[in-house]
């Protein structure tokens, strides 16, 4: 995408404390997106997961990946004003623990998209695009009227 990238909060319906994408780093509407999530340690889930050894829950990594995928979907003109929901999650693998102070690089490549559903593959890496793989998964989106 040419020009400045939009802010995730201007595209996604999610809000604090459930908005997990701080900024976009790449966007090809309807095709792919990448962004970052900086984990300060002040997030709501760290005190209870796990006391004395705070670790990002794996399902929240998948949610963060899905939010980046939702940005790729929602910036496609066919889906403007729609709401992409999780339709499924396949082949999720968790390779590294993510802890306070880490920055996740989140990226998604969309596959087939119909007018009501689509697929994508995503991953979360610690530290940047060339960082350590923390999570990978395949996503199924269902798109409904917003």
For each feature predicted by the language model, list its residue ranges:
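Flexible, low-complexity linker/boundary loops enriched in proline and small hydrophobic residues
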Residues: 1-25, 141
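Hydrophobic beta-strand-centered segment that forms part of the acyl-chain substrate-binding groove
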Residues: 2, 69-107, 134-141
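Beta-strand-rich interaction surfaces with strong enrichment in secreted/lumenal proteins
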Residues: 9, 52, 94-96
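Catalytic strand-loop segment that frames the active site of acyl-thioester-processing enzymes
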Residues: 16-56
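Hydrophobic/aromatic beta-strand elements that line small-molecule binding cavities or substrate pockets
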Residues: 22-23, 90-92, 122-124
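HotDog/MaoC-like acyl-thioester-processing domains
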Residues: 29-30, 98-102, 107-146
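Compact, glycine-rich, soluble single-domain proteins
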Residues: 47-73, 86
């Amino acid at each position: 995408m040419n020009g400045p990238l939009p802010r995730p909060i201007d595209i996604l319906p999610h809000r604090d404390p459930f908005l997990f994408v701080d900024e976009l780093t790449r966007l090809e509407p309807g095709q792919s997106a990448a962004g970052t999530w900086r984990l300060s340690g002040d997030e709501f889930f760290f005190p209870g997961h796990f006391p004395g050894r705070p670790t990002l829950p794996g399902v929240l990594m998948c949610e963060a990946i899905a939010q980046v995928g939702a940005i790729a979907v929602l910036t496609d003109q066919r889906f403007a004003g729609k709401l992409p929901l999780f339709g499924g999650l396949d082949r999720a693998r968790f390779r590294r623990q993510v802890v306070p102070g880490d920055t996740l690089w989140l990226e998604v490549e969309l596959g087939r998209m119909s007018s009501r559903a689509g697929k994508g593959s995503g991953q979360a890496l610690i530290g940047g695009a060339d960082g350590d793989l923390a999570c990978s998964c395949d996503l199924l989106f269902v798109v409904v009227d917003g």
